[in-house]
Curated annotation (Swiss-Prot):
SUPFAM superfamilies: GroES-like (SSF50129), NAD(P)-binding Rossmann-fold domains (SSF51735)
Keywords: Carbohydrate metabolism, Metal-binding, NAD, NADP, Nucleotide-binding, Oxidoreductase, Zinc
Cofactor requirement: Zn(2+)
Residue numbers binding Zn(2+): 39, 64-65, 146
Gene name for this UniProt entry: gdh2
Name used for this protein in its record: Glucose 1-dehydrogenase 2
Residues reported to bind NADP(+): 178-181, 260-262, 289-291
Keyword Cell inner membrane: no
Biological processes per GO annotation: non-phosphorylated glucose catabolic process
Residues the entry annotates as binding substrate: 41, 110, 146, 291
Top enzyme class: oxidoreductase
EC number: 1.1.1.47
Length: 348
């Protein structure tokens, strides 16, 4: 079968290879991927900055964001059947009894990222217990489930932490960044009924700005405009230390700051003492979140369904670039205005 591969640690080793078709072991299923999403983690792996091949392999098959059809089931599988359309979660525990998305570094494997082959191939295998079934009406946008699940977990944590203290009812939100994660965060917050401001460095007539406005949100071009006021929930989705600093100054008293970016080493925060004093004196919370489990994948699918109905098929508009296995390189070539790129494994 054909698969999109890299040799982790070797920059620009991206290749389309012929590899052996996998077989499902006990408790596993064989998948026929339909679509695979491409994200910044793939870019880091291709550049040789991250990633690990499975034990005994030199190469790693990419693809951790996927929607797929079950085509074969292994012994002992009772939660999935042939023909089911599913989304597989990413992580698998490694000597860890915690929920897998809370396992510390070194105690998990990740499809298409760390120690497990991904789904950017004609076939893939995964453990059946980590599958989420996809309703027929959202199969076309289900490839967005994995990045959305990360958002769902972060916002869910914000709500749970906030409401554990008192009857906290957030009304306003600020989203820093309008990439896929920032836009999906805007979508969730608007579905929750929060007045939401989203900011990025694109002009007001850009597609990203239009997508924010279609959700009923307010867009601010941070290259020329200033954000004013404080917000009950602030979501940082840029991965920029400078933007973290800005967000700290916009958390309302009793508010929650959700960090979803992965940040480079180095950098400094201006007025850190003053900002942290404000966090303490105003009972603010800062929480980081990564990955997600079954629950948040299910929440993501429900919000995709609602967004399709309530916002005129809005999720589909995030997919701005499509490629297939014959021109796979295009999927892994990033341009300034791409939002979400999808690799179509099964051509319609």
């Amino acid at each position: 079968m054909k698969a999109v591969t890299v040799i982790p640690g070797i920059p620009e080793s991206l290749r389309l290879m012929d590899v052996s078709k996998p077989n499902p072991n006990k408790g596993q299923v064989l998948l026929k991927p339909i679509r695979v999403g491409v994200c910044g983690t793939d870019k880091e792996i291709i550049e040789g900055r991250y990633g690990k091949a499975p034990e005994g392999n030199q190469y790693l098959i990419l693809g951790h964001e996927a929607v797929a059809e079950v085509v074969e089931i292994g012994d002992g599988v009772d939660n999935a059947g042939v023909g089911d359309i599913v989304v597989p979660t990413v992580r698998r525990p490694l000597n860890c009894d915690l929920p897998v998305d809370f396992c510390p570094v070194g105690h998990y494997l990740e499809h298409g990222i760390w120690g497990l082959h991904g789904h950017a191939a004609e076939y893939s295998v995964t453990d059946a217990k980590y599958l989420v079934k996809v309703p027929k009406e959202i199969v076309d946008v289900a490839v967005l489930t994995e990045p959305l699940s990360v958002v769902e977990k972060g916002i869910d944590m914000a709500m749970r932490i906030g409401q554990a203290r008192f009857d906290w009812k957030p009304r306003t939100a600020l989203v820093l960044g309008a990439g896929p994660v920032g836009l999906l965060a805007t979508m969730v917050l608007r579905l929750m009924g929060l007045s939401t401001v989203t900011t990025a460095t694109r002009p007001p007539d850009s597609l990203k700005a239009k997508l924010v406005k279609e959700l009923g949100g307010t867009y601010v071009d941070s290259a020329v405009g200033q954000i004013s006021g404080e917000f009950d929930i602030v979501v940082e989705a840029t991965g920029s230390p400078q933007v973290i600093n800005e967000g700290l100054g916009h958390i309302a008293p009793n508010g929650v700051y959700v960090l979803l970016g992965v940040y480079p080493s180095g950098g400094s925060l201006n007025n850190l003492g003053e900002l942290m004093t404000s966090v303490v004196l105003n009972n603010k919370v800062i929480v980081g979140s990564v990955n997600a489990g079954i629950k948040h994948f299910e929440m993501a699918l429900e919000h995709l369904r609602r967004a399709k109905d309530e916002f005129n098929n809005w999720p589909a508009k995030l997919i701005t670039k499509r490629a297939n296995l014959s021109n796979y390189q295009e999927a892994y070539t990033w341009t300034h205005d791409d939002i979400k790129t999808v690799l179509e494994i099964i051509q319609s």
